[in-house]
Amino acid sequence: MDVQAAHEFGISIAQAARDLGAGIAVFALAGVGMGLGNIFSTLISSVARNPASRPHVFGIGMLGFALTEAVALFALLIAFLILFA
């Protein structure tokens, strides 16, 4: 194997590792989707059982949504940093 072929092979391995790392970083988005579904299904269920608790439960649900969505944005940021940095 000559030097040029070895260099190109090393670059292709690095590209594959970078793409694989970005794909693994995006796996967190599946957990975020399940978490958001769980938050809102529980919110709807609790308001259906006790409509008077809606103002208190809705605020907590929105806080849970924001924190869960922050994890998604962080995972997306890491994936973009892996791909383009």
From Swiss-Prot:
Membrane association type: Multi-pass membrane protein
InterPro entries xrefs: ATP_synth_F0_csu (IPR000454), ATP_synth_F0_csu_DDCD_BS (IPR020537), ATP_synth_F0_csu_sf (IPR038662), ATPase_proteolipid_c-like_dom (IPR002379), F/V-ATP_Csub_sf (IPR035921)
Alphabetic keyword roster: ATP synthesis, Cell inner membrane, Cell membrane, CF(0), Hydrogen ion transport, Ion transport, Lipid-binding, Membrane, Transmembrane, Transmembrane helix, Transport
Subcellular location: Cell inner membrane
Pfam families: ATP-synt_C
UniProt-listed Gene3D superfamilies: F1F0 ATP synthase subunit C (1.20.20.10)
The keyword Hydrolase belongs to this UniProt entry's keyword annotation: no
Site (Reversibly protonated during proton transport): 69
Chief location: membrane
GO function terms (MF aspect): lipid binding; proton-transporting ATP synthase activity, rotational mechanism
Segments crossing the lipid bilayer: 20-40, 65-85
GO cellular component: plasma membrane; proton-transporting ATP synthase complex; proton-transporting two-sector ATPase complex, proton-transporting domain
Family: Belongs to the ATPase C chain family.
Subunit structure: F-type ATPases have 2 components, F(1) - the catalytic core - and F(0) - the membrane proton channel. F(1) has five subunits: alpha(3), beta(3), gamma(1), delta(1), epsilon(1). F(0) has three main subunits: a(1), b(2) and c(10-14). The alpha and beta chains form an alternating ring which encloses part of the gamma chain. F(1) is attached to F(0) by a central stalk formed by the gamma and epsilon chains, while a peripheral stalk is formed by the delta and b chains.
Function: F(1)F(0) ATP synthase produces ATP from ADP in the presence of a proton or sodium gradient. F-type ATPases consist of two structural domains, F(1) containing the extramembraneous catalytic core and F(0) containing the membrane proton channel, linked together by a central stalk and a peripheral stalk. During catalysis, ATP synthesis in the catalytic domain of F(1) is coupled via a rotary mechanism of the central stalk subunits to proton translocation.
Protein name per Swiss-Prot or TrEMBL: ATP synthase subunit c
Gene from which this protein is expressed: atpE
